[in-house]
């Protein structure tokens, strides 16, 4: 068995989307703090991986390409090659048959930790049951770190998922925004009006009304940010709203990593819940997100505060004196529509008023 200060190798496996990966970052940092001379490798899908390159909590990003995702033979070969490096710890946050393959090829690894699932996980030597937790971050730390405490290590937990851009990258984006006409003397809002996942999109008509409200009340600079595949849809929405010098849809963020310097140049994030909201929290700007019916606010909004706000359809049950039985019979669209525009305006006001730029 290795000691706390030994040079050890750690592999953390976390597939899925941007939000899932971001909320796994505290686990990676906790491992580095607990084992100060460790090297932490982080396995991610290729569309998410660039965000974590050169991150101080991660030593090496291992990318699973789209071809490897789709082709089982290429995937198995990739996992086999990755595990030729001797790992002292493997933590499989995903704990699916696909991700467990990393442990199948690493039978001599001292700690092979996965989440407890019935009739699965035969190649983990620690199958951890879920514990009571505050949110996703808390859940991963409470569920996956206890084996080290039981082994006598002094476990250090960290709950932050910070992101930073270099001063050059930040300045580059500021220049880009200035050239587009953004007035930094006014509140600059990164506005998430669209999502590649259709059920996450709060009704566009109401969003348009919110945009107009924020401009009328605060003279806000509204920036519709998007990935390359969303450009046409975003510019269509902008055209429908009409020509307005306070709305910008030409400031592109070509890669996921570009979102970091872009958000660092904004004062607020407002709009649909998603990975970008987690990133806004990670760079430290005030954020207010509208959660769709399938996203549990308690899980996906770590450490809510005046600076990190959210609203979900469940929150409207009490406000509208709605019987739970009736709510449960509603379609997702009907549940989503329970979040009225007045509530969203009020919460947007609260975010802006309580987090004014100093």
PLM regions: where:
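Catalytic machinery of carbohydrate-active enzymes
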Residues: 1-358
């Amino acid at each position: 068995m290795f000691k706390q200060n030994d040079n050890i190798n750690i592999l953390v496996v976390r597939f899925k989307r941007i939000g899932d990966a971001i909320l796994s970052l505290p686990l990676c940092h906790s491992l580095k703090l607990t084992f100060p001379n460790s090297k932490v490798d982080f396995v991610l899908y290729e569309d998410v991986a660039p965000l974590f390159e050169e991150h101080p909590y991660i030593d090496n990003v291992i990318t699973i390409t789209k071809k490897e995702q789709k082709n089982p033979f290429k995937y198995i070969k990739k996992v086999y090659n990755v595990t030729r490096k001797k790992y002292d710890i493997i933590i499989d946050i995903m704990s699916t048959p696909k991700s467990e393959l990393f442990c199948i090829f690493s039978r001599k690894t001292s700690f092979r930790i996965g989440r407890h699932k019935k009739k699965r996980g035969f190649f983990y030597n620690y199958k951890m049951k879920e514990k009571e937790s505050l949110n996703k971050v808390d859940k991963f730390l409470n569920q996956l770190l206890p084996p080290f405490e039981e082994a006598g290590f002094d476990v250090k937990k960290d709950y932050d998922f910070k992101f930073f851009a270099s001063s050059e990258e930040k300045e580059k984006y500021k220049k880009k925004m200035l050239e587009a006409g953004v007035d930094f003397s006014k509140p600059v809002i990164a506005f998430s009006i669209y999502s590649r996942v259709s059920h996450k999109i709060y009704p566009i008509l109401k969003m348009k009304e919110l945009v107009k409200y924020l401009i009328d009340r605060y003279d806000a600079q509204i920036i519709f940010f998007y990935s390359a595949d969303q450009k046409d849809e975003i510019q269509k929405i902008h055209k429908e709203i009409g020509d307005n010098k306070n709305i910008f849809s030409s400031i592109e963020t070509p890669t996921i990593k570009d979102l970091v310097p872009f958000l660092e140049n904004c004062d607020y994030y407002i709009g649909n819940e998603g990975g970008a909201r987690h990133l806004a929290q990670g760079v430290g700007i005030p954020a207010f997100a509208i959660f769709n019916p399938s996203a549990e606010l308690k899980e996906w909004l770590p450490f809510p505060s005046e600076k990190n706000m959210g609203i979900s359809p469940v929150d409207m049950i009490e406000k509208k004196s709605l019987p739970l039985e009736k709510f449960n019979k509603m379609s997702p669209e009907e549940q989503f529509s329970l979040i009225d525009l007045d509530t969203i305006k009020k919460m947007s006001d609260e975010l802006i008023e309580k987090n004014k730029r100093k």
